[in-house]
Regions:
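Short coil/turn segments
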Residues: 1-6, 52-53, 68-69, 74-78, ...
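N-terminal winged-helix
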Residues: 1-19, 24-26, 33, 99
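Hydrophobic hinge/microswitch elements
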Residues: 31-35, 40, 95-154
């Protein structure tokens, strides 16, 4: 996700390099599945990713921040006929996509045609400007409370930090863990500020 990459490159990497100038910190951007695979085969030390699942069955997972998903629309929930509803989703590889698809099917009894696929930050901007409807984390819509329509039961959405549970990590990684946690513990609350 571009928002995660931006925060890691501008906030996490400089602070970590200042604390540990002799340690090389490499940042790769991959899908959630690729990150998990890299952690499982020990080609990466830590992963930060979004998930609709609170934990991974093998990886040691820690929730950095959490939110619930809401239907985002300028109109009353389901007031527009399905054929006039512009549905926007994240791309199919994004972990949020499967949950968006499931929830749209639950709301409309079918998966409506998608008018746009984009990163959450772009969907946020488009919905804010009345371009279409989407499903996003609730706190991202804090500045647009009338656009939030809560779903029951409220589906969770999590920002996860994970690593392999039996891999021996050098002591310096505790500093990285703390830095990641401190940086991302209020990610969803500040999402709107980042992309306004």
């Amino acid at each position: 996700d571009s928002s995660l990459l931006h925060i890691i490159q501008t906030q996490v990497v400089p602070v970590f390099k200042e604390q540990h100038p002799d340690i090389q910190l490499n940042v790769n951007t991959n899908s959630r599945e690729q990150i998990q695979e890299s952690l499982l085969n020990a080609s990466a030390d830590y992963g930060v990713y979004f998930s609709c699942e609170e934990e991974h069955p093998i990886l040691d997972s820690r929730i950095l921040d959490e939110d619930e998903l809401v239907y985002c629309s300028k109109h009353d929930l389901l007031s527009d006929p399905l054929e006039h509803t512009k549905i926007m989703t994240v791309p199919k590889g994004n972990p949020l996509y499967a949950e968006q698809k499931r929830l749209f099917q639950q709301l409309y009894l079918t998966f409506p045609a998608t008018s746009c696929e984009a990163a959450p930050s772009i969907l946020f901007f488009l919905e804010k400007n009345g371009i279409g409807n989407t499903i996003l984390p609730s706190k991202t819509m804090a500045n647009n409370p009338d656009d939030r329509h809560f779903l029951t039961p409220a589906p969770g959405y999590f920002l996860i930090m994970a690593h392999h549970p039996i891999r021996t990590m050098p002591p310096v990684t505790r500093d990285l863990e703390t830095l990641l946690y401190d940086t991302f513990e209020t990610y969803f609350e500040h999402f709107a500020e980042l992309f306004s």
